[in-house]
Each structure stands twice: as structure tokens, then as C-alpha cells.
Amino acid sequence: MSFALEETLESDWVAVRPHVFDEREKHKFVFIVAWNEIEGKFAITCHNRTAQRQRSGSREQAGARGGAEAGGAASDGSRGPGSPAGRGRPEATASATLVRSPGPRRSSAWAEGGSPRSTRSLLGDPRLRSPGSKGAESRLRSPVRAKPIPGQKTSEADDAAGAAAAAARPAPREAQVSSVRIVSASGTVSEEIEVLEMVKEDEAPLALSDAEQPPPATELESPAEECSWAGLFSFQDLRAVHQQLCSVNSQLEPCLPVFPEEPSGMWTVLFGGAPEMTEQEIDTLCYQLQVYLGHGLDTCGWKILSQVLFTETDDPEEYYESLSELRQKGYEEVLQRARKRIQELLDKHKNTESMVELLDLYQMEDEAYSSLAEATTELYQYLLQPFRDMRELAMLRRQQIKISMENDYLGPRRIESLQKEDADWQRKAHMAVLSIQDLTVKYFEITAKAQKAVYDRMRADQKKFGKASWAAAAERMEKLQYAVSKETLQMMRAKEICLEQRKHALKEEMQSLRGGTEAIARLDQLEADYYDLQLQLYEVQFEILKCEELLLTAQLESIKRLISEKRDEVVYYDTYESMEAMLEKEEMAASAYLQREELQKLQQKARQLEARRGRVSAKKSYLRNKKEICIAKHNEKIQQRTRIEDEYRTHHTVQLKREKLHDEEERKSAWVSQERQRTLDRLRTFKQRYPGQVILKSTRLRLAHARRKGAASPVLQEDHCDSLPSVLQVEEKTEEVGEGRVKRGPSQTTEPQSLVQLEDTSLTQLEATSLPLSGVTSELPPTISLPLLNNNLEPCSVTINPLPSPLPPTPPPPPPPPPPPPPPPLPVAKDSGPETLEKDLPRKEGNEKRIPKSASAPSAHLFDSSQLVSARKKLRKTAEGLQRRRVSSPMDEVLASLKRGSFHLKKVEQRTLPPFPDEDDSNNILAQIRKGVKLKKVQKDVLRESFTLLPDTDPLTRSIHEALRRIKEASPESEDEEEALPCTDWEN
């Protein structure tokens, strides 16, 4: 029967979840019934005393003060049923005394207004019901007035009462009450029943102790658990509730109290909807309803009763389950029973001693395994069917899309949408195929495991019997070995297919990677996953070869056993009794020839199996070598990556240091420029605020300051005199700017020049002249003071103090001429060889010497000696490189000699080479060109595209190609290099 037909037949059926109405633990519930005169209905309230007690206990642990206050309120003497203390204490949880609410009081859960007449539950204390306490018992039997109970869910009064009960709870022995007296209107005790939880007398202490246990963590953590429920019910509503409860349990049919007749039709308009009842009738009816609800709770359970009374909307998912899940559970139960049956039979082997019993047990095991295989097949066929349908649907839909795209005239948007849909269906088909393969692997795992358990049990039985006794079971053992190898082989081949699919998916993902920040890292991760899959594939293929070898070994053993039986077969010959018997000798010879031919066939088959087993062994060694090579290459790749990372880390550390120094220099230069700008702004502001004010020091103060400076730094001057002919000192006091101006005298005062212009002029002069350090330092004037900036960019004066010399100071030279432009680079054809370079070098040195002295003075103030030395070294290296390049070029020498006219070139006559005897003109490109064949011009765009498609242009593409190459090296090539093993014997 097909699945579609089964769904059609079972469409009108529903599946109810098993154990849907089971309760995890028993709780104590209290029903309170009262009459609402305004609505004319019964107000039914239910309290979960167990949950309230648990909640009050947790609150008691949180705050002991609230418990003490509630205990004080409970001891005020208001122990009546209407008080909160009496309602929350355990003693008040199961009473059944008739009481009535005194006056009108609104209740939010019952009605908008009115005076509810409530029946209170008072627990008869065992001490009160004892013979020595008749007065208290008679006081319980008399109706009393009490306050109404608010019908709110999880009311605060109940919580406070629960806390009071927890604080002032008596001993457990005194609180264990299991029965309640039912009191009639006249005050006589009619019977004793259990109202809250209808348990037996001997079960009451156990139920109470269970109820007083702390709640589980899940219940304490759920703050939304309801402890109270309330509702208004008319007579008709209560009859409908009774019918539903009777459909669950028919024992409740005679338990519903008799309600008065309700007027119907026009009588409801004239006389109202509710019948007229006295207070005594109302109290009696309320109490009977309370007893009925308690009995219904004990008969049907809280879950059904609460759903019937207080639940408005039911979720069908809570009760029903789908038919597919039900059918799957049925298949799983059948499979579980088959497994249990096989396990029972395997356990019987320990007590079996005779071979006859063991053979019977083997036959039963074969039947049990066949039933297990059948149940497993049914289950997995059912599980595979949706994926097969999805695969077929996807293939059909893709075929329709292909036909539509080929035959219909569609626009670009429609074609694009169809292509997206085709890709979606292809993905769904691929996922269905993967699910089918996974389920196939699970199926063969179950069957192979069962077969192996049976085979291992039989091998254990073989040790208990001798060779002669075991000969009867040898054939079954060979069949079992063959079946185990076959099932394991099929399971391993299914695993191999799954791994190949995953490998193919990884390879496609590698090839579809696009450029990005995470592309290289993703490629490395995919390659690592591919390596793990490849190792798993090696293991699976090794197991496949091992199973094939076991199959061949089982066939060889059976063939060898047949050959030995044929050879050991004894033939007895009798004497001839007649002439006809002698004539039958030819037939006997023919039968012997047939036996010999059959023996030869068996031997030939054994040799073939031996050859196949040898090839399997060779393939196993090949796979082992490939696995070792794969592991070695992977380890080498990991080591190389580690080495590259270490090198990169080392280089990166150096680079980080360089970048850090560079950042510090930039930050320092920015700070210097900022301070310089601030200083210039201050100077400009000062000049604008105080124009023409110049403060000059007297001669006496200047001489005293010079003597102090000379006495303070004699050691520093001696050190500088040893290394350089002059000392560059920067004075950081701003007062010496005026002093430097005085030293120059009035004859040397020039027009004021800004600091920026002075600095730019000195820079250009240094770049143009590039004087050597010796010329600069030796030819400086004796004393030159210029207003400059030190490292802190404060106004200061730079003073150059030369060594003590007997020569008098010379007057400053005139201003220098502008620096000459740099010479243009000489062309190669006009170069005159190394002689010209040697002539130019002294001329350049002479020019450098002829540069005026004062031209280098400002640059010497702006740059220190190390920068001048580095500039001079760069000039020397550039000149040496030019000389080396010019000398080392032989073509330059030839051109120079041609220019000088040393020798002349001779025109060479064109000579034709004789063609090769074996070469054709069609294969010679030069011959074709001479004949006038035109070559095809290559387009630049095509050439550019061909170069852009090279794999080495993009690092990601290059990495992908390298990963694919490594994957190809790691993957086994045994399927291409060696022929596949003919394994049709066990594949069929």
C-alpha cells in the first residue's frame, strides 16, 4: 500500500499522544464553592495548596520578618474559616463544614457585585475529633458566619496565609489528616470523606510528606505558575462539565447533585433566570458540589479537570501528534522488539550445552535476524521516502525549467528568475541526496552490528565443542562470516560515497572563493577540512579492502573445505555378480571423470581467489604508502607555515619598531612645528604690542656673562676641539638675541629678515653647494651670531667659537652669488670614456673650493655634522656608480671610438644560408616571410586578457591552484592506475 493511500485512509483519524494526562507529582487542591446572587451562578474557586506552601516556604527563607508578622496575625484568635490565616494554614486545607458569607462583598473573580454565599473548608483537627474534645467538635458542626474569599489568582492573602502557616506549622504527626466529616444541615455527622485528595488512611502520612518536600528547581524558577483558579458556572454549565467528566470515567454519573429546575422560555422574562432557593438549600448544594469536585479530582485527575473547568482555549498540539510521527514510532517499536528478541536468544547460549539445542537456537537466531532486517528495512524505507520524493520533484522541476528556457521566448528578468529557481532546486536535490546517503549508512550500521553480534557469539560457542561436533555448524559459520563481511563492506562503501560527496563540495567551495579579507584564511580552513576528510577516506578505503579480503578468505576456506572433502571421499567397489555389472564400468569411469573435472574447477577458482587476494594486499600497501605521504606532506606544510609565521613575526617586530620610531618622529616634528608657530605668534604679538622697544645689555653685564659661560663649560669645549675645528653652541636664553645684534656692530646691521626665509635660504644653499665638511668648518668666520631656533624652538643665538688662533679676525665677505644649476646627465653617445669623468672630478672640486665662505655659514648653523657627512657620502656613491656603469659598458667604448674616428665599420654583405635538407619551407617561418606571407596581427585587448587570466597574477588564485595541486597529490589515484577488483560476487 502506498503512502499516499495510507494518508487518504487515515485522514479522518487523530493520534493522541501517550501519557498526555499523566501527572508528575500529586498536589493538594482545595475547591471552594459559593453562590453568586447577582449572576445567579456558582462561583467555584480552586487553590493549589502544595504550590502555595512551596512558594511561602521560599519567601520565608527570603524574609523571616514577614513570616513572624504573619505568625502574629495568625495568633490573634481569628482562626475562623474566613480569616486569611485559617485559609492558608494546613489545618484549613481540607475542611467541609457548612458556612455562609455574611453580607454583600464584591469579588473581582466571581462577579461585579453581590453577596457570595461560600462554603468553607475547615479541617477537623484530630485533637478536636478525639473523645476528649467534644465541645470543639460541636463548635465545628455549627454553621458560622465568615468573610468571603477573594477569588483572585495567586492572591496575596493566600501567600501571606501560606507564610503564616509555614511559620506556625505544628508537628507533622499532628497535621496528618486524611478524612473530613460531612455535616448535614441539622448538625449530624453523616459520613467521612476526603475532600482535598481522596487517599486512604494509611497513605495520608506519605502523601503529606510528599507534599511538604521542596519543589524542584524548575518549578521554583517558573514565576508564572498559577496557584488559584476561579470561574462562574450556571446549572447548565455544570451539567455540561459533568457529561465531559463522565465520558472520561463513568463512575461519576451518580455523583452530581440534583439541581433545581430552571425556568425556560417566557418564564425567564417574568420571574428571572435563577430559581428561588433558601439559604440552607444553597449551603447544602454548594457543599455537595464541593464534594463532587473533590471526587472528580480523584477520579479523572487534575489535568483533565482543570482543562474542563478553567481552560478557555486548548492547544491541539498538546494532545495530538501527526500520523507520520505515530507511524515512525510504530516502526521503531517493532525494530526495538526485534533487537530485544535477538538479545534474548544470544543470552540463552550461556546455558546451552548440547549441540542439538544449539542448532535449534541457531535456527531461531536466523529467523530473529530476518525479522530484524525486515523491521529495519521498513523503518528506513519510510524515512527515505520524503527525500526520494524531494529528489524526484527537484529533478522534474529542473527539467521543466530547462525546457522552458530553451523553447519559450523569455525576457532577461524571467530568465534570471528561472536560473535562480533552478539553482534552488539543485541545492534541494543535493541536500536530499546527502540525507539519503546518511540514512543508508545508518541502515547498514544496524544490520552489520546485529550480524557481527551473532557471528561473535557463534565463535565463542566453537570453543566449547570439538572439531567433530562442530562440523555440523561449520557451514553456518562460513555463511555468517561471509554475511558479516558483506554487510560491513556495504556500510563502508556507503561511508566512502558520503566522504567523496563532502570532498567534492569542499573542492567546489575552494574554486568558488572570491577575493576578500577572509579569503586566504577560509582557503586554509577548507584545505585543513579536506585533509581530515582525506584521512577518513583512507581509513574507510582500508576497511573496504579488509572486508574484501575477508570475503575472499571466506570463499577460499569454503572451497578448500570442499576440495578436502572431495579428496577424502572413500569409494568402495564390490565384486561383479553379472555380465551386465561389468558392462556398467564405463559409466563408473565417466562419473569418476566428472568428479575429477569438478575438483579441477574448484582448484582453479581457488587460484583465482588467491590472485585477487594478492591484488587486494598490494592495494592495501599502496593506500598505506599514500596515507603516509599525505601525512608527511601535511606536516611539512604545517612546518613551513610555522616557519613563515615566525619569519613574518620577526620581520613584523622590526617593522613595528620602525613604524613606532617613525610615529614618534612625526609626533615630535608636529609638536616642534606647533611650538615654533606658537613662538612666532608670540613674537609677532609682542612686536605689534610694543613696536620699537629694544632692550640692550650694558658692556659690563655682557662681559660678566661671558666669563661665567667660559668658566662653566671648559670641559665641553675641549672635547669639541678634539673632534672639530669649531664648536656649535646653542644658547637657550632669549635675552642674547640683542647681544648677538650688538656684536655684529652697527655696520653689519641689515634689514630684518624672518626666520622662515632664513631657514629656506640656508636649505637651498646647502642642497646646491654640497660642500665637504672640512671646507665648511675651516673657512667659517671667527664669530658669527645669527638669530635661530633650537630644538625647543625658543629664540636663541648660535655662536661659533673657533680655536684660539694668532690671526686677527677677518671682515665678513660679500654676499655669495646664486648657486649654479645642477649639470644635466650626459648622453651615452657623447660620452668620452673614463678620461672625461676624471677631468670633471677635479673641476668640480675646484668649483666647490671657489664657493664663498659665507654661503655655507647659514647651512652650517642649520645642519649638524652628521647630516653633512651623509650628504657627502651619497654624492660620492653616485659618482662612483656613474663611473662604474660607464666603464663597464663595451658598447659605450665602441660608440666613443667611433666618435673619435679610431676605426670605421664595414658594411656586411647579405648572405643566404643553405636550407636544411630535411626541413620544409612550410615549417620555416623566415622562409614564409621572405615569400610574402603576412602574419596575423594579435589584438592588444586579447593579449592583455590572456595575461590577466594567468594564475600567478592574483595571490588568491595562486593559493587556490596550489591547494588544488596539494589535494591532487594527497588524493589516492588507485582507481585510475589500477584496475578495479571484480567484486560481482558480493555486489549482487
From Swiss-Prot:
Residues 972-988 have a biased composition (Acidic residues). Residues 746-755 have a biased composition (Polar residues). Residues 51-178, 731-755, 800-865, 967-988 are annotated as: Disordered. Residues 1-126, 478-567 are annotated as: Interaction with p300/EP300. It is a lipid-anchor. The modification Phosphoserine is found at residues 115, 121, 713, 888, 974. Keywords: Actin-binding, Coiled coil, Cytoplasm, Cytoplasmic vesicle, Cytoskeleton, DNA damage, DNA repair, Lipoprotein, Membrane, Nucleus, Phosphoprotein, Ubl conjugation. One of its GO terms (molecular function) is actin binding. PANTHER family: JUNCTION-MEDIATING AND -REGULATORY PROTEIN (PTHR23330:SF8), P300 TRANSCRIPTIONAL COFACTOR JMY-RELATED (PTHR23330). The N-terminal region is involved in actin binding and actin nucleation activity. Acts both as a nuclear p53/TP53-cofactor and a cytoplasmic regulator of actin dynamics depending on conditions. In nucleus, acts as a cofactor that increases p53/TP53 response via its interaction with p300/EP300. Increases p53/TP53-dependent transcription and apoptosis, suggesting an important role in p53/TP53 stress response such as DNA damage. In cytoplasm, acts as a nucleation-promoting factor for both branched and unbranched actin filaments. Activates the Arp2/3 complex to induce branched actin filament networks. This is Junction-mediating and -regulatory protein.
